[in-house]
Amino acid sequence: MNVNKTVTIMLAAGLLMTGNVVATNKPAAVFTPEQEARIGEVAKDYLLAHPEVLIEVSQKLQAQQEQQQQRAMTAAAVQHQNVLLNDKDTPSYGPADAKVTVVEFFDYQCIYCARLAPELEKVIRANPDVRFVFKEFPIFGQRWPESVSAAKTGLQIWRQKGADAYLKYHNAIYATGHNEGKLTDADIRSAAEAVKLDASKAADVQGTLDEINLLAQQMGFSGTPALVVLP
């Protein structure tokens, strides 16, 4: 793939605002302690009288941070495009030669992933020429073990049953409406049984989860859902 092609990244995550320090070769002005105190009072009085200035500065800093984050993630997507697109252990749905691929990092217990799921299901149905890659990223696993169980079961279904069965399982888990700690082992078993997963032949997929977690870190993702669109 041509690395100059456009990479689009969308994610649900908070932004950390930071300021920029600009160095110049001009000598710094020297003020007496009294002058410094007076300057501080004037600045404080002005900001109290004009709080919109703080809002404007905050918005500008946030915009700068968004641009920096977008550039960093775009560069990471280009750098890791091979594993994003061609990892055989990662579930996918759609033509292998698709001109557009959508990669989703998600957790079945994530409420925002759950809200996105039915909309993404519509997109999949409406775009049979687009390939969708599903990166099981159970970030809530320490809080809710079922996040990891559901992710592992999904990967096992992918290996054993293929794309159609995986997508059916994936949608069935979200269709339970159980997230944020409400997903149960019974929910997972029911969805797996519906696609006839043979639990006695289930593969060990912890290594795949570890690789996805590492990839997410390299991409700069700390929350879900995260979507990467690659041409």
Show the residue positions of the predicted features.
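Gram-negative bacterial Sec-dependent N-terminal signal peptides
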Residues: 1-22
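Cysteine-centric redox/oxidoreductase cores and disulfide-bonded domains
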Residues: 64, 139-231
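Intrinsic low-complexity, intrinsically disordered segments enriched in polar/basic residues
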Residues: 3, 18, 67-69, 187-191
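Extracytoplasmic thiol/disulfide redox context detector
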Residues: 16-143, 204-223
